[in-house]
C-alpha cells in the first residue's frame, strides 16, 4: 500500500521546543561510564535524554534515565545489508516490547556493506526488505526508524536517507540530518534547498559546533565536531530553518572525539542551547 509522506509537524512559531540530548559519545572518552552517573549528570545539566549505544548496557541505562524522567531519545543501531541471516542485533525486538515500548524512541540505523560502495543504489534491493522488517517491528511498539547519514558508510549522504525513505514507504521510517557528516560531504552549500529536500522525511537531527562555509567540505572531525558554543557554522539559523519546516523531533548533540571532560563540554553546549532558545523567543 502506497504511503504519502507528510511533514513532521506544524511549525512551532517563536519557540525552540525540541528536546535536546547528547550522543553517547559525549561520555565514552572522558565521562562517567556507569549508567547511574551518566543519567545523574544529564539530569543535573538539564538535558532531556540520551542516546542508546551499547546494547548490553541499554536496559540499565534506560532504567536510570527513566528514574529521572529522561528519555532514550535515539538508539545508534548498526545494520549489515549484506547479511542474509542476522543483519542487526535481534535484542532490539525484546527491548521494544518491554522497556522501550511506546516511548517514541527513534532507531537511527547506520548501514554497512562490503558489497556496495557508499551511496550505491544497487544495494537498495538488499537493504529495503531488512529496513521494512525493522520498521514494521518498531511501528508495533510506537518507535521510528531513521537512516543515519555517515561519511564512508553505505548510506553516507542525506540523499541516501531520502531515497530509502521513499522506497521503504512506511510512515515511521525516514531520514536523519547529521550536521557534521553533511558538512563533510557537501560543505554547507545550498542549506535551505537541502532542508527542503529532506523535510518530508526528517525524523532525527544532530548538531555541534563546526566550521562552516565551503572549507567545511572534507575537513577533519576536529573542525567539524566542536562544543556547541564554538565554530563558525550558524547553528541558530539552522535550527530556525528546520523548525520552520515543521521539524518537532529531538535534537542530538554530536560529541565524537571532543577532548574536553564530559561535564565541561556538556555544560558549555547546554549553555549555548539555552542561548539559542532565548534568541528564538526574542526574534
Whereabouts are the PLM-identified features?
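Residue-level detector of anion-binding/catalytic polar loops
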Residues: 48-49, 71, 106, 144, ...
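Histidine-acidic metal/acid-base catalytic patches
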Residues: 12-22, 33-36, 132-136, 142, ...
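Conserved beta-strand positions in the central sheet of alpha/beta enzyme cores
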Residues: 51, 74, 108, 146, ...
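Active-site acidic/histidine proton-transfer and metal-coordination neighborhood
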Residues: 85-175
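Surface-exposed, polar/charged faces of alpha-helical domains
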Residues: 59-60, 129, 193
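Bacterial N-terminal signal peptides
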Residues: 1-7
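N-terminal pre-domain/capping segments
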Residues: 11-102, 170-174, 200, 267-283
Amino acid at each position: 500500500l502506497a504511503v504519502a509522506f507528510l511533514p513532521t509537524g506544524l511549525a512551532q512559531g517563536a519557540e525552540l521546543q525540541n528536546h535536546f540530548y547528547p550522543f553517547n559519545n559525549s561520555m565514552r572518552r572522558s565521562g562517567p561510564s556507569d549508567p547511574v552517573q551518566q543519567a545523574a549528570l544529564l539530569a543535573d545539566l538539564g538535558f532531556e535524554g540520551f542516546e542508546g549505544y551499547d546494547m548490553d548496557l541499554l536496559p540499565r541505562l534506560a532504567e536510570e534515565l527513566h528514574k529521572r524522567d529522561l528519555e532514550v531519545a535515539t538508539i545508534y543501531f548498526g545494520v549489515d545489508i549484506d547479511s542474509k541471516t542476522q543483519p542487526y542485533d535481534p535484542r532490539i525486538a525484546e527491548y521494544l516490547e518491554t522497556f522501550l515500548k511506546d516511548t517514541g524512541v527513534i532507531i537511527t540505523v547506520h548501514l554497512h556493506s562490503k558489497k556496495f560502495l557508499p551511496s550505491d543504489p544497487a544495494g537498495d534491493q538488499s537493504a529495503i526488505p531488512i529496513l521494512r522488517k525493522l520498521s514494521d517491528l518498531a511501528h508495533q511498539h510506537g518507535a521510528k526508524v531513521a537512516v543515519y547519514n555517515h561519511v564512508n558508510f553505505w548510506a553516507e549522504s542525506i540523499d541516501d536517507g531520502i531515497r530509502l525513505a521513499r522506497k521503504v514507504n512506511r510512515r515511521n521510517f525516514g531520514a536523519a540530518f547529521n550536521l557534521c557528516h553533511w558538512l563533510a560531504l557537501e560543505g554547507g552549500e545550498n542549506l535551505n534547498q537541502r532542508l527542503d529536500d529532506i523535510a518530508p522525511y526528517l525524523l532525527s537531527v544532530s548538531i555541534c559546533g563546526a566550521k562552516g562555509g565551503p572549507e567545511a567540505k572534507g575537513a577533519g572531525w576536529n573542525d567539524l565536531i566542536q562544543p556547541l558554543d564554538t565554530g563558525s557554522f550558524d547553528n541558530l539559523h539552522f535550527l530556525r530553518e528546520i523548525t520552520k519546516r515543521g521539524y518537532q523531533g529531538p535534537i542530538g548533540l554530536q560529541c565524537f572525539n571532543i577532548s574536553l571532560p564530559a561535564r565541561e563540554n556538556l555544560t558549555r553546549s547546554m549553555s549555548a542551547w539555552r542561548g539559542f532558545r532565548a534568541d528564538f523567543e526574542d526574534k
